[in-house]
Amino acid sequence: MSKDTIFSAPIEKLGDFTFDENVAEVFPDMIQRSVPGYSNIITAIGMLAERFVTPDSQVYDLGCSRGAATLSARRNIRQPNVTIIGVDNSQPMVERARQHLNAYHSDIPVEILCDDIRNISIENASMVILNFTLQFLPPEDRQSLLEKIYRGLNPGGLLVLSEKFRFKDDTTNNLLIELHHAFKRANGYSELEVSQKRAALENVMRIDSSNTHKVRLKNVGFSHVELWFQCFNFGSVIAIK
């Protein structure tokens, strides 16, 4: 696994964060050291896939990056005639996802597409995964994407939505931000790396509260919505149609 050193030296002209070749190369290390509870979420996605994926249906991983959630789901699906469709708008991520998934034998076909998730049709879905993806979409596009997912899910289908959260109470919000930064420092990131990455993400990752997500999902039509995992200011919501 290549180590993330992207922000380790001072960057004079710090641009917006992008999922380019450099990020794709170190992404597994970056996300493990940056997102508390990430491995737990990936493992649980497989457990949820085993429970919710139905025969003759499709599974979508929207914003699949290098395919960790796709692989976890595929390893645990026990039903026949299931297809997994992974989508990411970063060509370097897509290329690595294909390589990663092709390294493991499976009878479940996986199609990895390089496209904007807003352009993808969702059809005959028993499970949809949005793992730290929605936060990178313009806020005005989030409702329409969730509506499309809801329409494309079969009755009883599952959406897994993992995100970084903000909190209404400033004291709590600041505490959880500080704990997240402490988590990153404990994983070997310097103060410079933490501050430069935070600045690079400022304009491209706009986060909502967990309550905003839950209300939005209920407004879309989901019958059962619940926060099932949280560690500091990162968490995951399940929504069942």
From Swiss-Prot:
**What keywords tag this UniProt record?**
S-adenosyl-L-methionine, Transferase
Membrane-crossing residue ranges in chain numbering: none
Question: Per the record's keyword annotation, is Transferase included, yes or no?
Answer: yes
Biological processes annotated in GO: tRNA wobble uridine modification
Q: Which reaction does it catalyse?
A: prephenate + S-adenosyl-L-methionine = carboxy-S-adenosyl-L-methionine + 3-phenylpyruvate + H2O
Q: Which residues bind S-adenosyl-L-methionine?
A: 38, 63-65, 88-89, 116-117, 131, 198
- Give the GO molecular function terms: carboxyl- or carbamoyltransferase activity; S-adenosyl-L-methionine binding
Q: Name one Pfam family in it.
A: Methyltransf_25
- Entry's InterPro entries? CmoA, Methyltransf_25, SAM-dependent_MTases_sf
Write the Enzyme Commission number(s) for this entry.
2.1.3.-
Checking HAMAP family in the record gives: Cx_SAM_synthase
- Role description: Catalyzes the conversion of S-adenosyl-L-methionine (SAM) to carboxy-S-adenosyl-L-methionine (Cx-SAM).
- Subunit annotation: Homodimer.
What does the sequence similarity comment in the record state about its family? Belongs to the class I-like SAM-binding methyltransferase superfamily. Cx-SAM synthase family.
Name of this protein: Carboxy-S-adenosyl-L-methionine synthase
Which organism does this sequence originate in?
Actinobacillus succinogenes (strain ATCC 55618 / DSM 22257 / CCUG 43843 / 130Z)
- UniProt lists the gene as cmoA
